[in-house]
Design a protein with these regions (language model features):
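Asparagine-centered strand-capping/turn motif at beta-strand->loop junctions
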Residues: 29-41, 169-171
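Short beta-strand/loop motifs in extracellular/secreted proteins, especially
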Residues: 31, 41-46, 104, 175
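Beta-strand-rich, repetitive solenoid scaffolds
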Residues: 36, 47, 69-73, 124-128
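Short, intrinsically disordered N-terminal pre-domain segments
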Residues: 1-24, 147, 173-185
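Short, surface-exposed beta-strand/strand-loop-strand elements in extracellular ectodomains
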Residues: 36-58
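Loop/turn positions that initiate beta-strands
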Residues: 65-66, 103
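Small/polar beta-strand repeat architecture
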Residues: 74-90, 94-102, 107-180, 184
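Extracellular and analogous surface-interaction loops
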Residues: 21-29, 94-99
Length: 185
């Protein structure tokens, strides 16, 4: 067995009955989760998705008292160099080769204007422009975030693909799942 290195501890998802539970949004760092199902309750199903409405799509069963290694995605990041404010937000990125796609959800970090970090937090990508000679080969990413009332963006920041984990207990006895993002050591 290959050793695992902890990248991030995303906490635990727990339900005392058959009600589903969802995590807060988290940035995809390695794309590999180690899930440990507590032996105190019953088994459960786990999925990683963009919204709580997608629960159960591509879910995996984890037996109580067992662990499960789950490759759920790949990291995707882009450096933001400019922002056009509005009811939707258009961000200019510094490199045309990003793995962020329309339909992904992203979170901004590192903005010197802190309200951008909290406003562009797990929001949907609605459009991506193609770099062409007429636009100096720049690429823009449009997200569903209203930044019209924020101060002007200055400096740089980063957007990263973000997701949520969703737990569906197997029975009305509930389930507790510990969620750890790992990398192979």
């Amino acid at each position: 067995m290959q050793a695992l290195k902890l990248v991030a501890d995303h906490g635990e998802l727990s339900s005392n009955n058959a009600t589903t539970a969802a995590s807060s949004a988290f940035v995809v760092q390695s794309g590999l989760l180690y899930l440990a199902c507590s032996s105190e309750k019953k088994s459960g199903h786990i999925s990683v998705c963009n919204t709580v409405a997608e629960a159960g799509i591509g879910s995996f069963h984890v037996e109580k008292g067992n662990g499960f290694l789950y490759r759920y995605g790949h990291p995707a990041h882009a450096k933001v160099t400019a922002v056009t404010k509005g009811a939707t937000t258009v961000m200019t990125i510094d490199h045309v080769d990003t793995k962020i796609q329309v339909g992904d959800y992203v979170t901004m970090t590192g903005s010197s204007v802190g309200t951008y970090n909290s406003t562009v937090a797990h929001v949907e990508v609605t459009a991506i422009s193609d770099p062409q000679s007429y636009n100096a080969y720049t690429k823009t990413i449009t997200v569903d975030a209203d930044t019209s009332s924020l101060a002007d963006f200055t400096g740089t920041a980063q957007i990263s693909k973000s997701v949520i984990a969703r737990l569906a207990p197997e029975t009305s006895d509930g389930c507790t799942m510990h969620v750890h993002e790992v990398n192979l050591a």
